[in-house]
């Protein structure tokens, strides 16, 4: 709604990008983490759906859906994106595309990732975090339930409970800090840490900046 409002809508506080910088940065990082590929070039198109939003003149809880009276709002022009489409080129020559939206009704925090190979497609939906959809060319498609006994060791290391015991969003932070604390206990950082570092944070900032450059110039931009 045009009454949805928080500090991220104000560029002087949050910067010149919103949907990409706020939630797209996480998706772009996940893509590189899972695939092992690096994004080398981007082409972006931004869209601001609500060009004017109503800023509450009194406190209102984020995500609450509560409405104030008309006189309790001030009209504010919006200069950051509600929605973005980004084409990606990877360092191995493959392509990808990303859609990020903060104006999709009913989608509070969904992350969907789909990777298509030469023979199979794998899809993950964060709203069903214990399932992976596997698309096949010459047999029935499959839904794989999370089960440490069926996973590679690298994946099993990120699972705490046995199959049939759900794990979800809150467990991701737990798994992250297990790796961080293990490095602290060892007294040194691994040569190739699985957890994000300052270098990863810098890279995501750089990618977001290049995406901004692309939407402004309407051209492909190298990372």
Which residues make up each language-model segment?
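C-terminal glycine/acidic-rich active-site capping loop/insertion
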Residues: 33, 47-92, 114, 119-195
């Amino acid at each position: 709604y045009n009454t949805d409002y928080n500090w991220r809508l104000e560029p002087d506080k949050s910067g010149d990008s919103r949907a990409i910088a706020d939630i797209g940065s996480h998706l772009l990082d996940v893509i590189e983490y899972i695939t092992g590929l690096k994004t080398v070039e981007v082409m972006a198109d931004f869209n601001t759906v609500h060009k004017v939003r109503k800023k509450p003149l009194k406190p209102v809880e984020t995500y609450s859906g509560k409405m104030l009276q008309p006189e309790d709002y001030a009209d504010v022009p919006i200069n950051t994106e509600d929605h973005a489409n980004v084409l990606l080129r990877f360092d191995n020559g493959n392509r990808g595309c990303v859609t990020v939206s903060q104006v999709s009704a009913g989608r509070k925090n969904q992350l969907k990732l789909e990777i298509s190979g030469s023979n199979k497609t794998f899809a993950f939906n964060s709203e069903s975090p214990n399932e992976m959809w596997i698309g096949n060319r010459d047999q029935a498609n499959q839904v794989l339930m999370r089960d440490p006994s069926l996973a590679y060791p690298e994946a099993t290391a990120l699972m705490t409970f046995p199959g049939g015991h759900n794990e979800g969003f809150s467990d991701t932070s737990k798994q992250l800090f297990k790796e961080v604390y293990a490095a602290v206990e060892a007294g040194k950082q691994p040569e190739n840490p699985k957890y994000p570092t300052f270098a990863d944070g810098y890279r995501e900032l750089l990618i977001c900046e290049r995406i901004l450059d692309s939407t402004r110039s309407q051209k492909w931009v190298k990372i």
